[in-house]
């Protein structure tokens, strides 16, 4: 399709409704059940289409649900990007995993010093932050390397998986340890504590103290017993309190001087805080009573440039992402989101680029400090909208990218009523943003990174559905008269479509396609 050759509206606003999927099912669909006059009007009167946001369309295995990291990477990248989950699984299948230099070097250090190897990771089949088969592969590698003490500190999911589903993963890895005879699960803790990303350092501290001092609310003889104890306390997997697994006459297993740690989460954002607690020489977020001097600390993927650890699978470099391409042409752009999704509209949208590009400003709106977001389903959407409306009216930017976290973050709680309220808040915010845009002659593309809020209950497990979905997501254009092509697109088509509407050809690195024609 040819480049749009008329005067291009300004600003163009890309609105990402995080966790907003499309489903014809109306029961337990918080989006369909919500009162959404603005969205109803958009779908009735403006051009719209659907996009694939899961599986191969976003560089994941067939059937694998999408997630925010992958979604933003494809929205900003404009191309299919092989994801870490796929890369690592392929390395396991080919045998390359078992020859990985970073892993082998760390394991050899532990063997030479007769020290323990501690595996940290989300023990889950979810495939969003980790996958349990990859943890099993590392246990296998450590066994074949002759490591005598292999300890798994299992972080439990219940968010990208059903709320009470950890037992199967625990039993599988326990059977593997029994077969090898040289390892065990040493501790359990819910991801609520170990994988915080919102600087709630009191949660991270509980995980760190469990790992380094054995400080635990509960003690159990086996991991299964520890999990059942958590369930008896009314906790689901995500919220399992720090639990040490050991015999009554033994001391807890902790990470000690000379030991090796391998963090097996492949997604960076929720692994950073705990990693900083181990590695940051200038760490001040809480008082570390113990800081073990480790022989090695390996991260499965790169978590951040200022985290100095060996990396088993370094990132693929992306060039000419949406942000970089616009920056090189002198366009001014703004990224705005609340804390929970700030990394996604900056780091991930920019293809893993930490620093802003020239002409790129960033605005962080703090997320509310509540235990879970069903307690405040509006989160910080109204505050962000207030800022956004003001910025639109000032006419300082060519492109504004914003993310509304509510459908995803409230959807993850499994609270259908709260999620419905969250959708209604977003609907009100969209009305204000579109009104402001139309008053200055601006335009909007509205999309999502993956599904979530459209499925709030799982009939198969008879539990609340707290995970993402593999459903399609919308793409709505609010602007000039236009028509979308008939074929379903994918998230990597968003950037080429956006560039077309801004009157720009896409760069050759972008393999996604423009989905719209201006009339």
UniProtKB/Swiss-Prot annotation:
Q: Which InterPro entries does this UniProt record tie to the protein?
A: Alkaline_phosphatase_core_sf, BPG-indep_PGM_N, Metalloenzyme, PGAM_B_sf, Pgm_bpd_ind
Q: Where, in this chain's numbering, is Mn(2+) 1 bound?
A: 408, 412, 468
The catalysed reaction is: (2R)-2-phosphoglycerate = (2R)-3-phosphoglycerate
GO molecular function: any one?
Answer: phosphoglycerate mutase activity
Q: Which residues form the active site?
A: 68 (phosphoserine intermediate)
Q: Which GO terms describe its cellular component?
A: cytosol
- What stretch or stretches form a coiled coil here? none
Biological processes per GO annotation: glucose catabolic process; glycolytic process
For this chain's record, the cofactor binding note is:
Binds 2 manganese ions per subunit.
The family this protein is said to belong to: Belongs to the BPG-independent phosphoglycerate mutase family.
Oligomer and partners: Monomer.
Its name, as the record gives it, is 2,3-bisphosphoglycerate-independent phosphoglycerate mutase
């Amino acid at each position: 399709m040819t480049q749009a050759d008329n005067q291009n509206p300004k600003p163009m606003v890309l609105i990402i409704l995080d966790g907003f999927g499309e489903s014809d099912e109306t029961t337990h669909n918080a989006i369909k059940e919500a009162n959404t006059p603005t969205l109803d009007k958009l779908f009735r009167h403006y051009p719209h289409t659907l996009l694939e946001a899961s599986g191969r369309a976003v560089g994941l295995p067939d059937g694998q649900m999408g997630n925010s990291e992958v979604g933003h990477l494809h929205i900003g990248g404009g191309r299919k990007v092989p994801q870490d989950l796929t890369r690592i699984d392929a390395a396991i299948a080919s045998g390359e995993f078992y020859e990985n230099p970073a892993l082998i070097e760390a394991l050899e250090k532990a063997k030479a010093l007769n020290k323990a190897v501690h595996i940290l990771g989300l023990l889950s089949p979810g495939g969003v932050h980790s996958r349990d088969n990859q943890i099993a592969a590392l246990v296998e590698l450590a066994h074949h390397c002759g490591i005598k003490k292999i300890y798994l500190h299992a972080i439990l999911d219940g968010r990208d998986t059903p709320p009470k589903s950890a037992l199967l993963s625990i039993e599988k890895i326990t059977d593997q340890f029994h077969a090898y005879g040289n390892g065990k699960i040493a501790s359990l803790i819910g991801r609520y504590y170990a994988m915080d990303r919102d600087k709630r350092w009191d949660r991270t501290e509980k995980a760190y103290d469990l790992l380094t001092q054995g400080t635990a609310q509960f003690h159990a003889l086996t991991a299964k017993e520890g999990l059942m104890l958590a369930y008896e306390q009314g906790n689901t997997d995500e919220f399992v309190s720090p639990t040490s697994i050991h015999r009554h006459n033994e001391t807890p297993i902790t990470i000690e001087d000379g030991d090796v740690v391998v963090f097996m989460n492949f997604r960076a954002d929720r692994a950073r805080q705990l990693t900083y607690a181990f590695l940051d020489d200038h760490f001040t977020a809480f008082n570390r009573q113990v800081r073990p001097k480790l022989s090695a600390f390996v991260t499965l993927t790169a978590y951040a440039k200022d985290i100095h650890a060996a990396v088993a699978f370094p990132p693929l470099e992306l060039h000419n992402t949406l942000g970089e391409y616009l920056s090189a042409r002198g366009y001014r752009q703004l990224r705005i989101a609340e804390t929970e999704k700030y990394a996604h509209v900056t780091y991930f949208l920019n293809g893993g680029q930490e620093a802003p590009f020239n002409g790129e400003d960033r605005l962080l709106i703090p997320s509310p400090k509540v235990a879970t977001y069903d307690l405040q389903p509006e989160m910080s959407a109204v505050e962000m909208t207030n800022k956004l409306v003001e910025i639109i009216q000032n006419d300082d930017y060519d492109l504004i990218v914003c993310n509304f976290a509510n459908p995803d973050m409230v959807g993850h709680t499994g609270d259908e009523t709260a999620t419905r309220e969250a959708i209604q808040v977003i609907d009100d915010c969209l009305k204000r943003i579109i009104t402001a845009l139309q008053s200055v002659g601006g335009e909007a593309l509205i999309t999502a990174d993956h599904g979530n809020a459209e499925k709030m209950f799982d009939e198969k497990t008879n539990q609340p559905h707290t995970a993402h979905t593999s459903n399609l997501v919308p793409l709505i254009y609010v602007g000039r008269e236009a028509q979308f092509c008939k074929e379903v697109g994918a998230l990597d088509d968003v950037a080429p479509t956006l560039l077309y509407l801004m009157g720009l050809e896409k760069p050759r690195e972008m393999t996604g396609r423009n989905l719209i024609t201006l009339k």
